[in-house]
Design a protein with these regions (language model features):
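Feature captures hydrophobic
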Residues: 1-153, 159
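Conserved class I S-adenosyl-L-methionine
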Residues: 168-176
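Conserved SAM-binding loop of SAM-dependent methyltransferases across substrates and taxa
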Residues: 179-190
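Conserved SAM-binding loop
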Residues: 207-208
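A short acidic, Gly/Pro-enriched loop at the edge of an enzyme's catalytic core
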Residues: 228-237
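A short glycine-rich, Lys/Arg-flanked "PGG" loop and its adjoining helix->strand segment in the class I
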Residues: 252-264
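Conserved beta-strand signature within the Rossmann-like core of class I S-adenosyl-L-methionine
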Residues: 265-273
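Substrate-binding/catalytic lobe of Class I Rossmann-like enzymes that use SAM or dcSAM, i.e.
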Residues: 273-350
Length: 350
């Protein structure tokens, strides 16, 4: 019965599974690079009862080991078996998904700080080892295919700066300012008066230190502040890689706050990850281990929230393939760094 279920779950690829009882299950259509994995009894229970969470947890705990191929090969098989064509589903399924989306993303101020700390306060030293030298933790802009990650992140900041159309002396708010690289760039040229807000104590400390070393303390101020608590206005607002932490129930509040904080002739550039299809729910593994409270929005959700807030959309740009290249660079650097394995235990690294 379990073997039949596994074969039903895996529709494509070439997957061989060594079962706890010694039997071997072949699944998929045989196409692509072969992958062989071995599961313990505990790992098998996890896979069958809750695949979206169980696959990752089984791998982390070594209840699932890969003997041929790579983890990325396995994930490709699993992803393709899940299908790429959006299915609308029944009204009940859509209602369940909407309920799950809401419950997962109730991000009040306390929850927001806790969720940000879970991901960003792990260790600045970790991020320094696989990000670019400016510590840009968001999609780079590969204007040319031969660009290095450093060059692509410089191009990303220039691309955003061009969209913002800042003139010297403008007050600019950076929502989710991270380690401060974008704020410092816009302060240096074209000379904006930057305010960056973050909920991460680790990011705040390093960003403040970096601004001081660069001689930009008079041009850039970083605050440990929830964006919803700001009460001043700005000529421009930029937010890169932060909307994913807002949560679907708070999209309208987010854009209403953006409108409230902008001057009458102000404008904002919001840069975020977007899901391929319409509204959905966050993967269980991502929700538990990577971005608690996070939710990747569908474009339709963003447009609706922007319009409801009374803002005008003047430009939409899709950078999906640029993020694929960015993630590839991060993964390569993470795996190649000799110090990272000494900083964390095997479960964290897996």
């Amino acid at each position: 019965m379990i073997e039949a279920l596994l074969k039903k779950m895996i529709k494509v690829g070439d997957l061989t599974i060594h079962m706890p009882n010694g039997s071997v299950v072949k699944a998929g259509d045989g196409a692509g690079p072969p992958v062989t994995m071995r599961v313990t009894a505990k790992g098998l229970r996890r896979l069958v009862t809750n695949p979206s969470l169980g696959l990752g947890e089984a791998y982390m705990d070594s209840d699932l080991t890969i003997e041929q191929g790579t983890l990325w090969d396995l994930l490709e098989i699993v992803g393709k078996s899940g299908g790429r064509t959006p299915k609308r589903g029944s009204a009940l399924k859509r209602a369940r998904k909407a309920f799950k989306r809401t419950v997962q993303s109730v991000n009040d101020r306390i929850a927001s700080r806790r969720n940000v700390a879970h991901h960003y306060d792990v260790s600045n030293a970790l991020y320094e080892r696989f990000l670019d030298t400016d510590m840009q933790y968001s999609c780079a802009y590969f204007a040319r295919p031969d660009m290095t990650l450093e060059e692509a992140q410089v191009a990303k900041k220039a691309h955003i700066g061009a969209k913002l159309n800042i003139t010297p002396g403008m007050k600019v708010l950076d929502i989710g300012s991270g380690w401060g690289g974008l704020s410092m760039t816009l302060a240096a040229d074209p000379g904006a008066k930057m305010t960056g807000v973050t909920l991460s104590t680790e990011q705040l400390a390093l960003a403040t230190e970096r601004a001081a070393k660069a001689g930009l303390s008079d041009q850039v101020e970083f605050r440990l502040t929830d964006y919803r608590d700001l009460d001043e206005t700005f000529d421009r607002i930029v937010s890169v890689g932060m909307l994913e932490h807002v949560g679907a129930p708070n999209f309208r509040t987010y854009f209403e706050t953006v409108k409230r904080l902008l001057t009458d002739d102000g404008s904002a550039v919001i840069h975020a990850i977007g899901r391929m299809s319409g509204p959905g729910a966050t993967n269980a593994f991502t929700q538990k281990y990577i971005f608690p409270g996070g939710y990747i929005p569908g474009l339709s959700e963003i447009v609706k929230a922007v319009e409801a807030a009374g803002l005008w959309i003047t430009d939409i740009e899709i950078l999906r393939l640029h993020y694929a290249d960015t993630l590839r660079e991060w993964r390569t650097r993470f795996l190649a760094d000799p110090d990272i394995p000494t900083m964390f235990d095997a479960r964290f690294l897996r």
